[in-house]
């Protein structure tokens, strides 16, 4: 019987299935950070248990770490306590840990693939909603809650219900200036933030195949923003070439056997999906979100939508509230929206390819006078090192952009990087919820190139015209 990629990944990890469909699923890789793990470790300690499979766990501090000078540690007491607790638990249980001062430290969804901790065919979980990022490698990856973090630590398994399967087929040549971020925003704009609810999404088609692993990670990262449990891409040569030689990748005969298996990780011809969505990449333009949900997005040459033209009363009400919060009026051209700050970073867009794209836009130019702050936050210490070897840091600094240390930063404002009330930000992150980047802050989701262009011009512009 023809199987989808999701079917193959699921079935190869089933330990047992109950009469109600509840499945005990084996977990290959468990990623942990400082925000969702403290209670899990405390529960483990109170129960007198220890991690079942020490080598399956990889820990890193990312949400609360400062992106400025780290020589004096973390000023905020709550943030400091969370990181210190992570440090203690790592040493207490002998788990691999990249501390704040380790050059391998970075955002958990950047360092996992970077280290080869994420490999094709794996089940990958983390107490973080954007764990779907790792599905780009032909893996089954999704976020879990704190109680589930404890369960995985103790048993190396997870109780789960199988999702339905959705295929998002993207075909066509990607236009110049249009990126993976624009593709995934266009997908979410098409199906909505609830469109993927109850599904695991496989992203396929010639456009997806043409993307680098960085681009595929961006796509899968935001599968959760479409409501999906997981996002994934079939394995191909791009996947295999990326993971080869990584610190935790197999070597020698183990590599050969692994590659042989990885090449089977694709949906079979004739496999049935519960839902199929198509998108013509040639029609996609650079995207800019205008509201307080990722589905509230339009092309850069468009206008802020008019709620009066929305027939659905619930959607109309949401649009009206979003416009009030965002301080925007219907029919305003997107290119007339001025910004106060720029954030280039997050687990969506902080990899070397993202930084190169942004640097190419700002090279030889300077930040607009009305832009108070433009910050670039690499996804890991290793990304930062590579960017500096390529001279990208100098390009950004010469353009008036700040070059920071790695971490989650302004994506969710859990450290000192945040917006003030009313400030408007061109952000390469994944969520534009109310207060996401700071109380009263207004977030517009864009690609790295679009964020960089807005920082130079002081308002949104079509990067294709630069």
UniProtKB/Swiss-Prot annotation:
Q: Endoplasmic reticulum: present as a keyword of the record?
A: no
Q: Which GO terms describe its biological process?
A: L-leucine biosynthetic process
Reactions listed under catalytic activity? (2R,3S)-3-isopropylmalate = (2S)-2-isopropylmalate
Class of this enzyme: lyase
Name the cofactor(s): [4Fe-4S] cluster
Residues recorded as binding [4Fe-4S] cluster, renumbered to this chain, are 347, 408, 411
So what EC number does this one have?
4.2.1.33
- Cofactor comment: Binds 1 [4Fe-4S] cluster per subunit.
Q: Which UniProt keywords apply?
A: 4Fe-4S, Amino-acid biosynthesis, Branched-chain amino acid biosynthesis, Iron, Iron-sulfur, Leucine biosynthesis, Lyase, Metal-binding
MF terms from GO for this chain are: 3-isopropylmalate dehydratase activity; 4 iron, 4 sulfur cluster binding; metal ion binding
In which pathway does this enzyme or protein participate? Amino-acid biosynthesis; L-leucine biosynthesis; L-leucine from 3-methyl-2-oxobutanoate: step 2/4
According to the record's subunit comment, the protein's assembly and interactions are: Heterodimer of LeuC and LeuD.
Tell me its family: Belongs to the aconitase/IPM isomerase family. LeuC type 1 subfamily.
Q: What does this protein do?
A: Catalyzes the isomerization between 2-isopropylmalate and 3-isopropylmalate, via the formation of 2-isopropylmaleate.
What is the name listed in the Swiss-Prot or TrEMBL entry for this protein?
3-isopropylmalate dehydratase large subunit
Organism of provenance: Herminiimonas arsenicoxydans
Taxonomic lineage from the root: Bacteria, Pseudomonadati, Pseudomonadota, Betaproteobacteria, Burkholderiales
């Amino acid at each position: 019987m023809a199987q989808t990629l999701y079917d193959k990944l699921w079935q190869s990890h089933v330990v047992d299935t109950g009469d109600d469909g509840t499945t005990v699923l084996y977990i290959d890789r468990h990623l942990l950070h400082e925000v969702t793990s403290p209670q899990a470790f405390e529960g483990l300690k109170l129960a007198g248990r220890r991690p079942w499979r020490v080598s399956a766990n990889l820990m890193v501090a990312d949400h609360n770490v400062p992106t400025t000078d780290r020589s004096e540690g973390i000023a905020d007491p709550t943030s400091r306590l969370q990181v210190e607790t992570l440090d203690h638990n790592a040493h207490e249980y002998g788990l691999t840990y990249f501390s704040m001062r380790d050059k391998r430290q970075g955002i958990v969804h950047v360092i996992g693939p970077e280290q080869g901790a994420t490999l094709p065919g794996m089940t990958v979980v983390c107490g973080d909603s954007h764990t779907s990022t790792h599905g780009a490698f032909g893996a089954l990856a999704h976020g879990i809650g704190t109680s589930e973090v404890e369960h995985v630590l103790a048993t190396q398994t997870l109780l789960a219900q199988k999702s339905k399967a959705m295929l998002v087929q993207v075909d066509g040549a990607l236009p110049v200036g249009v990126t993976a971020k624009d593709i995934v925003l266009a997908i979410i704009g098409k199906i909505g933030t609830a469109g993927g609810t109850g599904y695991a999404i496989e992203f396929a088609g010639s456009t997806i195949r043409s993307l680098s692993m960085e681009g595929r990670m961006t796509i899968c990262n935001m599968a959760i923003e479409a409501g999906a449990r997981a996002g994934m891409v079939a394995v191909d040569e791009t996947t295999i070439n990326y993971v080869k030689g990584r610190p935790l990748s197999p070597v020698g005969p183990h590599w050969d056997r692994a590659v042989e298996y990885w090449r089977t990780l694709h949906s079979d011809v004739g496999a049935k999906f519960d839902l199929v969505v198509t998108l013509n990449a040639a029609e996609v333009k650079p995207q800019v979100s205008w509201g307080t949900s990722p589905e509230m997005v339009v092309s850069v040459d468009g206008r802020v939508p008019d709620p009066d033209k929305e027939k659905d009363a619930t959607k109309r009400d949401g649009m009206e509230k979003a416009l009030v919060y965002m301080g925007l009026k219907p029919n305003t051209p997107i290119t007339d929206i001025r910004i106060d700050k720029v954030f280039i970073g997050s687990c969506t867009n902080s990899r070397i390819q993202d930084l190169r794209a942004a640097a190419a836009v700002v090279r030889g130019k300077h930040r607009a006078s009305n832009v108070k702050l433009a910050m670039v936050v690499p996804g890991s210490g290793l990304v930062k090192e590579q960017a500096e070897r390529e001279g990208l840091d100098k390009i950004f600094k010469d353009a008036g952009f700040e070059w920071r240390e790695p971490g989650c930063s302004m994506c969710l404002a859990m450290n000192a990087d945040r917006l003030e009330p009313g400030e408007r930000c061109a952000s390469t992150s994944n969520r534009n919820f109310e207060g996401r980047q700071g109380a009263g802050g207004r977030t517009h989701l864009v690609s790295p190139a679009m964020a960089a262009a807005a920082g130079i011009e002081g308002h949104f512009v079509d990067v294709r015209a630069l």
